[in-house]
Amino acid sequence: YLYSSIYPSKRDGMDRRECRAEVKESIEYDQLRTIYRFDELEEIVDLITDVLCSTRATIRIGGEDLPIEAVKDRFWRLEQSHIEYVLDRMKETTTKIRNIRGYLLTALYNAPTTINHHFQAEVQHDLYGKQH
């Protein structure tokens, strides 16, 4: 996976506090607070901020070491609906999660690419799944 830009981002010089503030704004934190617990959201914001402020070359996502810049690019695109999706899936899971940080990192990374398929499957189930 190649990172799509060779130019440094305007966010590269951002300190952790500024980064965290931008994350909260981009995921519409205040709106999410009306739905989810404070501690749940703080963990998510901290995790996203950790990734975006990382200086490592790679990060482990879903058992693979991916280039940090590719992961940062995906994490900068996270929005309120992605956070809702991840937190709601967490509540639905019945299996024991041994590495919660790894699970959340993978879920957040995949959220922008899987959210539409999830909702399409839900609609299909609601329309056709109850006939059996």
Predicted regions located by residue number:
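Electrostatic interaction modules used in gene-expression and signaling proteins
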Residues: 1-132
